[in-house]
Amino acid sequence: MMNDKRIGLALSGGGYRAAAYHIGTLRALNKLGVLKDVDVISSVSGGSILAAYYALHKENYNEFEKGFIDRLQKGVLNSSIIYGIAVLAIILSLATLISFILYQIGICSGICVGVGFMVFIGLIVFVVSKSFTILPISKLVSEQYDKVFFSQAALSDFPEEPMLSINATNIATQQIFSFSKNSIGEYAYMLLNGKSLFDATHFPIADAVMASSCVPYGFTPVTIGEKFRKGKLSYCRYGSFI
């Protein structure tokens, strides 16, 4: 019987385009009377933007859809500005470095040119090694997610039903890393008492969605601060992976 079955909805990724496409999915399910019976939503990347916003505003579908479409337009614009500034900064930096090298070639000996080249390589290595902190693109986008979509909501603000799992990838273990109302993490971060090392109560939804939509090299990884930890690494089964 239908009542004995659970309904799961998977929303895939693809940035803001995927989020826009999934509006059609939810609209169709709502018209069929199925959306209200969905028990579990699993999402990634652009699908997580829509899934998280829907979970917070599911009580009135029409208001949810209108509100999301309005905010989606703002989100696309804001992200375009952020990316534009980042690209411009990179172009200007490279132009400066190239100009420096060409200048050195024009007036210096081979040794001087070699020094200039080594400085150039050193700067590249420095930027790559410190990209977590000096290129906080993910932090900027997360702030925009929060401003446009989530208004400082935390994972604990999600409803009990449908159960929402926002999925990301843990670069330390190469495993699926999930965010939900009552849990953060994966098996490698389970304490000996069977609970997660991380506290989901006050963890920002915007950060969870950013982690889910964090395309490698396009964004910097999202880290989880000490204030969201409930235990010590020495009591974690797989603490060496953290």
What are these regions, as identified by a protein language model?
Residues R17, V113-I242:
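Active-site gating loop/helix substructures
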Residues M1-M2, L32-L35, F150-F158:
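Surface-exposed acidic, glycine-flexible loop patches that form ligand/cofactor-binding
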Residues M2-I7, G231:
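A short, charged/proline- and glycine-enriched loop
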Residues R6-A10, G15-M118, G122-F132, P136-K139, ...:
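Patatin-like phospholipase
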